[in-house]
Amino acid sequence: MAAHGLKRARPAELVPGTLSVITARMDYLPRDTPPDWVDHEWQRLQRPGEAIVSVYARGRDYHKVLRARLQQLADRIAAQIGPFGHRVFTDSAPVLEVELASRSGIGWRGKHTLTLHREAGSMFFLGEIY
């Protein structure tokens, strides 16, 4: 982490020319998740002989999904304003994503170091466009 100190704290050190950062969140659960999903999870916890995979790891690789969505957003922006140098990050570079999310209004850093949001809790991924 020390080797990337300046790159973490100064976006332009990581991607030269960066003036702004777009920060986004993607919820763990798909939109069509039944409202009683928590009840099902509690029932699963009552069966100690059954292995349980964490909710965030049950779907497709979030790195690929969120990166693709952010790239689509960057492409739409470029279609409106013209080409701009950018990079998309999803947990893949020395980026202070929790700090960026806090500053952008997505949430705040909880005592457990995750970003918290009043409705979503901490059940979401973060990604950035530099």
Regions found by a protein language model. Name each.
Residues M1-Y130:
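Auxiliary alpha/beta "docking" domains used to position bulky ligands
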